Amino acid sequence: MATPSAAFEALMNGVTSWDVPEDAVPCELLLIGEASFPVMVNDMGQVLIAASSYGRGRLVVVSHEDYLVEAQLTPFLLNAVGWLCSSPGAPIGVHPSLAPLAKILEGSGVDAKVEPEVKDSLGVYCIDAYNETMTEKLVKFMKCGGGLLIGGQAWDWANQGEDERVLFTFPGNLVTSVAGIYFTDNKGDTSFFKVSKKMPKIPVLVSCEDDLSDDREELLHGISELDISNSDCFPSQLLVHGALAFPLGLDSYHGCVIAAARYGRGRVVVTGHKVLFTVGKLGPFLLNAVRWLDGGRRGKVVVQTELRTLSGLLAVGGIDTSIEPNLTSDASVYCFEPVSEVGVKELQEFVAEGGGLFVGAQAWWWAFKNPGVSPLARFPGNLLLNPFGISITSQSLNPGPFRTPKAGIRTYHFRSTLAEFQVIMGRKRGNVEKGWLAKLGPDGAAFLQIPAEEIPAYMSVHRLLRKLLSRYRLPVATRENPVINDCCRGAMLSLATGLAHSGSDLSLLVPEIEDMYSSPYLRPSESPITVEVNCTNPGTRYCWMSTGLYIPGRQIIEVSLPEAAASADLKIQIGCHTDDLTRASKLFRGPLVINRCCLDKPTKSITCLWGGLLYIIVPQNSKLGSVPVTVKGAVHAPYYKLGETTLEEWKRRIQENPGPWGELATDNIILTVPTANLRTLENPEPLLRLWDEVMQAVARLGAEPFPLRLPQRIVADVQISVGWMHAGYPIMCHLESVQELINEKLIRTKGLWGPVHELGRNQQRQEWEFPPHTTEATCNLWCVYVHETVLGIPRSRANIALWPPVREKRVRIYLSKGPNVKNWNAWTALETYLQLQEAFGWEPFIRLFTEYRNQTNLPTENVDKMNLWVKMFSHQVQKNLAPFFEAWAWPIQKEVATSLAYLPEWKENIMKLYLLTQMPH
């Protein structure tokens, strides 16, 4: 099938003017999906002629039937039937309602005849948009390779009828909508037409809210909220971007968990996780959804085999289902989870021709397993759903009640908010609902990840954003001059990042001021730089490999590597500041400042608006060894590796390497801090040897092999997403913590509580964690262990919270209220473990963590996990610890207590003393 660009050129070849009949008032056309494109657009941005494809056939739609019998438009009409006819020489059929068109075509040497019915032998069929008897025949004709030229307007038809839902009842729409083109009841302006040399843009917004309000009401009938609080799942956030798509459940940040859409003659409902098909509280909504998807046909409802629980929920509401592995030819509604690319086209045609699709899927796990690959572009569910105007993102939502849109109250939608943003940017005034611009930025950045090449519906948004952002200088967010997120400047930061990552010309994105990270201040080397990168990864997850290179902001770089490495699933990443700040109220930097992409070609170009250190992401179990990586457009950054970098090399790098961020590395820990801080470090070796001792202790307590298979990373940033520091890969901290990381004297005297707390968080395992009680507790075991065994700082001095009088008071307060595991959290929970450690030492913990690593099929519920811990620790120390844990109000099961009764009593149990001396409550 020809590309839309080539098709547009063919349709416009030789057309120099639009001499349309003055008395023919057209209607505006609405374009959705990935195949439709505009041909004629007036100066108001309204599409009046459009084209598309469906199946093996093609479609041209004009917004008034009189245009098809206007001799002045002969050049265009000839182009249209020529492009529509896939079989050269095949006759053109013209419906009697357009008889003058046959004469126009015949007068130009085209074999055209008046035909009351469409026939398979025809190459093209021309008809007005009011015929109600040939709908199925026309769709089949087009699907099988025929060309359809259709014209009409719906505003007058709407004025004469009782049904106001023109998009779904106008006869022409029952045909053209399968290819993504709708006649609307909006009158088209005819005061000025321009013959476009290149394909015009599709407008961001065509008003059709009235056509969708009944759908929303039917789906949410009797439902005030969508409560998934007890679903035990984190659904993906949905991006609702289609003109006929609408949200049904929103959180306080306008994050969408369930959405619906019209597409062609069919309907779609999407949930952000398949588990939502099993949530009992959603039962009324699930019933509403299936009935709406069925559209009153009372047809067959097919449920994918893996989702059989949904079948039971629907049966309670009186809906019979058929459990099948795949879609069946007689289905009216199909409920399933998309897990592969197989059958995408068939499913899209199923919907376009009237079917109902109920989809449940999340993309965050797929995104985790495929770093550097956008789920908007490659996740199987989105290959199916993107044309419907709903996409599943990698952002997760917290389970909880989601509000539903209320009639008469405006609800956030990407397209309507983008249209308002466009108005404000043009007029420099206007208001948008609270929180909408903060949501527009990340939504726009996500939308820009959808592959847009030769897809006019997406490219039009790209073009609009390029135009808007090129008019104004890009805000520069700093701590001294933060940018408010929920405003146009905040939205610009996210949208500009998305544009840059989509490959747009970065020269259009000029900052308000040049900062030290921008290319004018960091001149990249004119010659390519080649570095050897260790691409062996024995770990169980991907890892970042440092290159010692920095990419200036707004720089396009070219990365080259050997052919063999280009097929090894390597990725490239610019930047290490991975925190997503899209929900921050104020921004001290861009909300998303890294860029990742696959190194799937020997030579690859990549851009990053903000710049950053350059990394190669190596997949787990990679055995590539050393790989030469050549980069054009980079500068050197300070980098020190313990055992490899000499002191002379370090001093030279600090003086000569201009990168504003640098790294200190061992085989077990990598610290990323500003170069300005590194310049105060004359010799990193003593510091890093101390850090290696710390990491060895961390590994020893956690029963991990040392050296670590995957070095931990700590990255300093001007702003992070949560807390003073937070765990993860990498661990993130504020710039104020840099001295705590790189000042050896300070570490030895004051300690390392914050960083080791996060290293401890990374050591926690769900098998022996009891969230939320121990989330901020057990990680501090590593703090105590490191401070006492490596730094020689006793626990009472390492943290004021562990001063003995404070500890005793905490326990007594816990007991005085009546011991209850609901109140057993954080420091109180840590006390339980410290009492055990002070009695039995560290070795039982180390042996226990080793035992946990070697076991499989461990329980997942807190009560069962806590009882297993009691049993295993009791066996480690050969004491019956059930009474000790009962004193702490752990839910000890009777059979566990009985099974431990044979062990000796723990006579030194300190909780006995507390209980004996506790005042009655």
UniProtKB/Swiss-Prot annotation:
Name of protein: TRPM8 channel-associated factor 1
Tissue specificity note: Isoform 2 is expressed in the prostate and strongly expressed in cancerous prostate samples.
Chief place where the protein resides: membrane
Alphabetized InterPro entries for the sequence: Class_I_gatase-like, M60-like_N, Pep_M60_3, Peptidase_M60_dom, TCAF
Organism: Homo sapiens (Human)
The organism's place on the tree of life at top rank: Eukaryota
Ranges where the Peptidase M60 domain occurs: 542-841
Biological function: Positively regulates the plasma membrane cation channel TRPM8 activity. Involved in the recruitment of TRPM8 to the cell surface. Promotes prostate cancer cell migration inhibition in a TRPM8-dependent manner.
Gene Ontology BP annotations: negative regulation of cell migration; positive regulation of anion channel activity; positive regulation of protein targeting to membrane
Intracellular or extracellular location(s): Cell membrane
Membrane-spanning parts: none
GO molecular function per UniProt: transmembrane transporter binding
Keywords: Cell membrane, Membrane, Transport
